[in-house]
């Protein structure tokens, strides 16, 4: 599907976003591990989260979607999964594959998990290595690196003390989910703090888990987790597209309600504020052990910054839209230490560089990031490629709002992977 984006003068709107993708995945998995009913409100029904739902049902979970954003999980406890009769397909979802590898490694049965063309080229050895040390057996392509992956699980999961080579919430979460089955204490130590949704949710459901700085300590379950009512806050990664839209269009004010403001996710807000963004968090509260608030965003004059090191894991998903903000910032913006972007749904460093050059932006590609010279006009009258990457597609749509002429974006349907309602909300903010 090809779409055309035409420029807009300003944005003045109030919006509410669908549920957070990371949290929706985890609520399905942890609810299935628990005993009793878990009712999930504001669930994100996207291609990625439905991959998780379908895989869980394939191994014996009982999950019913009773409306677009409401799901009921009839939890049977951690020891009641069954061997699947077919290959499990995570499609495009790396979160599904990596977190489910943690669960499957601790089951006393055989399973095979695969994905689409893109996911089968994403690195999995970083998850296989620690789970193998815990007792799971894995067989994968290219010397244990790529899916399809055969898993011979075991009920004799061993506790582990593990230092992750990179900060990765998915690697950490896979270990923590397997550790629920271990007898004793498992520690995960990261070089920098990554998203902590899994830790917060496990604690909310009754696990014995503690965090200190970049170390997480969890004890294996002596009784099942308990099903809970759960509200999924709005997705801050999804909000970031509209935040940047309001910042870079003139005379704009945008209110985004009930957004998750977990400190391990607000890196994008910190970076944008460093750039001079007028963003305020109001009406703060805590729901299900997750901080939530409303975001008030106003047009701002931005300046270039350098982003590197420990900040990168906290904004890794938002770098494509941050690049759009950088095109309108005064001076140079540098992104470095972000080589992980090359192993996402597409090589995002290359994709961002190629598409921004089409739009007339002065950008220099580097091995681990890029430099953007800002304060530039975005040139329209061209067709951009999404590379079937949802975050690239949505970032280009935001760029189109301030282009001097309309732009077209190919394969825009890929936004359904994470944000099926994007086009509807995008049109809403333009029309008010």
UniProtKB/Swiss-Prot annotation:
Q: Which domain of life is it from?
A: Bacteria
| Pfam families cross-referenced by the UniProt entry | EPSP_synthase (PF00275)
Quote the pathway field.
Metabolic intermediate biosynthesis; chorismate biosynthesis; chorismate from D-erythrose 4-phosphate and phosphoenolpyruvate: step 6/7
Which GO terms fall under molecular function for this chain's record? 3-phosphoshikimate 1-carboxyvinyltransferase activity
* Secretion signal span: none
Is Nucleotide-binding set as a keyword in this record?
Answer: no
PROSITE patterns given for it? EPSP_SYNTHASE_1, EPSP_SYNTHASE_2
Q: Name one GO biological process term.
A: chorismate biosynthetic process
Q: Where is the active site?
A: 317
CC terms in the record's Gene Ontology section: cytoplasm
So where does 3-phosphoshikimate get bound? 21-22, 26, 168, 170, 317, 344
Where in the cell does this protein reside? Cytoplasm
Q: Which UniProt keywords apply?
A: Amino-acid biosynthesis, Aromatic amino acid biosynthesis, Cytoplasm, Transferase
Record field: transmembrane: none
The annotated subunit structure for this chain is: Monomer.
Family, as annotated: Belongs to the EPSP synthase family.
Q: What does this protein do?
A: Catalyzes the transfer of the enolpyruvyl moiety of phosphoenolpyruvate (PEP) to the 5-hydroxyl of shikimate-3-phosphate (S3P) to produce enolpyruvyl shikimate-3-phosphate and inorganic phosphate.
- The entry's protein name is 3-phosphoshikimate 1-carboxyvinyltransferase
Q: What species is this protein from? A: Petrotoga mobilis (strain DSM 10674 / SJ95)
Lineage, highest ranks first: Bacteria, Thermotogati, Thermotogota, Thermotogae, Petrotogales
